Amino acid sequence: MDIILKASIPKLREKLLEALQAVLPIVAIVLVLCFSIAPVSPSILLCFLLGAAMIIVGIMFFTLGAEMSMSPMGERVGAMLTKSRSVPLIIGVGFLLGFLITISEPDLQVLANQVPSIPNMTLILSVAAGVGLFLVVAFLRMLLGIALPKLLVVFYGLIFVLAAFVPKEFLSVAFDSGGVTTGPITVPFIMALGVGVAAIRSDRHAADDSFGLVALCSIGPILAVLILGIAFQASDSTYVPPILPNVSDSVELWHLFHEGLPTYIKEIATSLLPIIAMFGVFQLAALKLDRRTLGRIGVGLAYTYIGLVLFLAGANIGFMPAGNYLGQVLAGQSFRWLLVPIGMLIGYFIVKAEPAVYVLNKQVEEVTDGAISASTMGAALSAGVSLSVGLAMVRVLTGISILWFLIPGYAFAIGISFVVPKLYTAIAFDAGGVASGPMTATFLLPFAQGACEALGGNIVTDAFGVVAMVAMTPLITVQLMGLMAQLKQRRARQAQPVSAAALAFADLPDDAIIEL
């Protein structure tokens, strides 16, 4: 154990540098706004800065912890299920994994509180069942080799048909649920399951099919909330803004965070326990990993736990009030149109601080053998989230229905999926669920809510939906990146000189070449 801890110290330093590069640009933007056009109280600013420090340390521990624990656990379980060749086992375990992981996701509790007309436990169980069902669909797709775009057409078609019958109060929350429930605990494990399943296959499409699990799992919550929206009558939901901190000195500031920490200590423990318990069953029944491997996974789980506690405490206590207040101040100015470019700027950088984005970018780089680098993926995600936040701010200012953005957006994303390389499509639809994580829920959503409140808009219909917009645009930007890469490769092949022998064979049919 001591050897594992010592070996992880250099990696922690590396992760700290990555975390600083991700969070400091957001801090710089907020500080510039606070000292120029959007003044805030010292209390809010101090909470924001302490929250930022906790987020940096949290990202450092989480990213290394996920690499050491969540990824190898998921890969080994996925590989074991595939080796079993038992469809009933894959269906049963797949559903149970999806259900248990989702039911303990902290962000799902937040979502349930935002829909007062549906009992909390009814919503939580329905969404968890939706994720479990679609994790089974994702497994079967990989094993049967079904093309992802075909399933996306069917299921998103069903979603938009149901949306026509759902009260408008449910629409934004329903589409937000798809991004909220694929959080920092769910994503690393589910993505690793995909890699494990694909690793057992030896065909040339195995790498393509290692992605797409998060994409399909994001559909389950949307369908669940839409169906519940039809079954339950919409009620007048009362928006409760976050309580703005009011601390007069450093001791009160520490007490504010110290009092909030036990909540996240308990939440993250509850979230990780089902995954640990399921892995323990697999370890005893089939995996039989050696003590050194288990020790490494144990240290990784400890890092993951510490990282998520610090991250969520910093985001909820420090970032959420700051985001809400900044939105109010900017929308209350005569130059409220600045919400759009400022929102785009914040969106561009904030996705870099999403914990699960690190896991996605690293896995993409590994599976593609560096053909798609982590920096390229990061740029595509940043561009997508920047665009989505800009469009979300347009909605806040104008009150336009979210369907005017989602229907053409998803139609375009699914349409180009039939001409884009399969790998890019699967990565793109996974990226949508990954990008819309806790940073979106704790800063961008409160930012939109604060702006909407200052403008006197309908927060339920106009401010909610930011998560859905953030989940949609990466589908387009990542696929466009793939399309450009495909065109670049085609031009490179066309530019290569062709030998006379190759030209002679080019005009012959395939069977003639085989006979020769």
Predicted features and spans:
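Intrinsically disordered, low-complexity non-transmembrane regions of multi-pass membrane transporters
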Residues: 1-19, 23, 74-88, 202-213, ...
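Helix-loop-helix junctions within the multi-pass membrane cores of secondary transporters/permeases
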Residues: 78-80, 87-158, 336-417
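Juxtamembrane and boundary regions of transmembrane helices in multi-pass small-molecule transporters
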Residues: 2, 138-153, 169, 173, ...
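Hydrophobic core segments of alpha-helical transmembrane domains in multi-pass membrane transport
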Residues: 24-37, 51-61, 93-100, 130-141, ...
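Interfacial loop-to-helix junctions that mark the boundaries of transmembrane helices
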Residues: 13-19, 40-50, 82, 115-124, ...
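Transmembrane helix-loop junctions in multi-pass membrane proteins
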Residues: 32-46, 66-74, 100-115, 134-146, ...
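Transmembrane helical segments that form the transport core of multi-pass membrane transport proteins
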Residues: 243-356
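Alpha-helical transmembrane segments and their helix-start/interface "positive-inside/aromatic belt" motifs
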Residues: 14-22, 46-52, 80-88, 148-153, ...
